[in-house]
Amino acid sequence: MKSIIPPQNLSELLKRANMMAGISLAQIATHRGINVPNNLKRDKGWVGQLIEMELGATAGSKPEQDFLHLGVELKTIPIDNHGKPLETTYVCVAPLTNIEGLTWQNSLVCHKLQRVLWVPVEGERHIPVGERRIGTPTLWEPDPQEQALLQQDWEEIMELIALGKVEKLTARHGEVLQLRPKAANSKAMTHSISEDGSLKMTNPRGFYLKTAFTAMILNKVFG
């Protein structure tokens, strides 16, 4: 399978993304010689990976933006027939140790969300995976108010992690950003800070954008 050359500039990336609008996932997969899964229960990241590949994303699983040379992160977002997000959006793994001196400005969440190319995809479960169509993409940069909301949530969450209270953090914490266990296997474990400052074992956590926030982003663009 021939790999796609990364886009040279922002206009080329947007052109590629706009050319996908209205196309089904099966059309892209067939063109690339990729099998379409019957469902996404075991292939949760399949849609995102397919679109990353088609657009020529470079990051893979590295902790950096998908198009680092353009300063753009790619996010596919499953939507219902009213254009509303169907699930939260994964941003990145949350650091649970060695966080002394970490600030919002030098955090991976801030880096990833500086500029995002949102690609909506039909996500209603009654639509077979291959028949789901890609929507119109939009390039988003957080405005000062959105940036402030993200920073406030991140700082509050990180403060609780630093105090050894990661177990007390639930998906309800945060107005726009939440912390949740991040592992397909609940037996996966990693180190975190305990309340007495020593290390303990816990499930890995990830940062996610809440659906109300992503709905607001899409609504600003598409009304």
UniProtKB/Swiss-Prot annotation:
GO cellular component: cytoplasm
Residue ranges that the Swiss-Prot or TrEMBL entry lists as coiled coil: none
One Pfam family hit: MutH
GO terms (BP aspect): DNA modification; mismatch repair
Keywords carried by this UniProt record: Cytoplasm, DNA damage, DNA repair, Endonuclease, Hydrolase, Nuclease
SMART domains tied to this protein: MutH
Purpose: Sequence-specific endonuclease that cleaves unmethylated GATC sequences. It is involved in DNA mismatch repair.
The protein's name: DNA mismatch repair protein MutH
